Amino acid sequence: AINQISITEERDEAVDFSDGYYDVNQAIVGFADSAAAGATSVADLQGLRLGAQQGTTSLDFITEQIQPEQEPFVYNDNAAAKAALDAQQVDAIVLDLPTAFYVSAVEIEGTAVIGQFPTTGDSPEQFGMVFEEGNPLRDCVNEALAALEESGELDAIEQEWLSEVVDAPVIELAG
């Protein structure tokens, strides 16, 4: 499956992943007039009602990096998290950056990407394609990804379809 799935150690125990094809940051989406608007650091977000889908790197990011004063609101899927934001039951939701841009541009009128968070740790979060363990197609896909990377085509695709990422302000992790 190619569907914005982040490569994690826990997931890698159950499935095989292709090599990473896109470095992704987490982002926060809220209404332009919400308590989250204008946030420049995680300290500005810690007192807010934040939500994310269960089992996602977005939820992990809230608990591990933002460390809000109250437990995050956890939803079964992104549709429920978006509905909670739309109903203003939460101040903001955390999503991966491409999803955040789509939500704010297409799905929930009046929202904006408040900001994106910088990469943390030794390696960036990456999207990878998911395969059943032992599937021989994974090696073929990895070869194709390597060729796309080497030719510059992967970068060109990112610039054409995901170049908005440069427009999202960075929210500092240090208070």
Placement of each model-derived feature along the sequence:
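Short helix-initiation/N-cap motifs at beta->coil->alpha
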Residues: A37-G38, F73-A87
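Ligand-binding clefts/hinges and TM-proximal coupling segments of bilobed small-molecule sensing domains
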Residues: T57-P72, A112-I114, E143-G175
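Periplasmic-binding protein-like
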Residues: D23-G30, A105-E143, E164-G175
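A ligand-binding cleft/hinge motif common to bilobed small-molecule-binding domains
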Residues: N3-A14, T63-E64, D91-S123
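Acidic, polar ligand-binding/catalytic clefts
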Residues: A1-D44, T119
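Short helix-loop capping/hinge motifs at secondary-structure junctions, enriched
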Residues: D33-S41, F73, G134-D139
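Short loop->beta-strand "edge-of-pocket" segments that line small-molecule binding or catalytic clefts
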Residues: S41-T56, E71
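Hydrophobic residues within well-ordered alpha-helices
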Residues: L45, A84-D86, M129, V141
